[in-house]
Amino acid sequence: MKRIVLLVGGVETLAYFSIQMGNEWKRMGYKVFYFDLEDEMNSAKKLRRFIKPGETVLVTFNFEGLEKEAGVYREGIGYVWDEYAVPCYNIAVDHPYYYHERLADLPEKYYHISIDRLHEAYFKQFYPEFTHRGFLPLAGSRLEELCKPNTGKEVENNRLNIRQK
């Protein structure tokens, strides 16, 4: 895939994540399009020109762009992502139980990514019908193997026991 769609204009921190990732992908030679949730209809026109089937993916956080927003979803027609067969990679920052209703109607090529091992286990158990693309540690998070020798403290379930601090 040579083209990446990211979303901005929604939750400020999620837009920040998207912009930072987009900057790096641009540096790596990918074409990046920012769909602006504050200007959905104008962004939708530009989005349709940007998408090249077979070359474009959506990378989003917490279902932004997958909530039937104007510009990416039309009643009776569905998502633009399905129309152009765009794979949708959703990095779920919050616990999956917040998203039960959103999981009811998603694009055909929806892929779920968890940032927490417990969220990942919950998602696999209660939503086996979706393709899970695994665990993505938060940037700046240390891997368990690196954390133990440096701190001498136990890391359990991706969390440091507060009594050990």
Language-model-derived ranges and their functions:
Residues 8-11, 17, 129-165:
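Nucleotide-sugar donor-binding catalytic core of glycosyltransferases
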Residues 1-6:
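Extreme N-terminal starter segment of soluble prokaryotic enzymes
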Residues 14-126, 144-145:
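Extended catalytic core of nucleotide-activated donor transferases of GT-like folds
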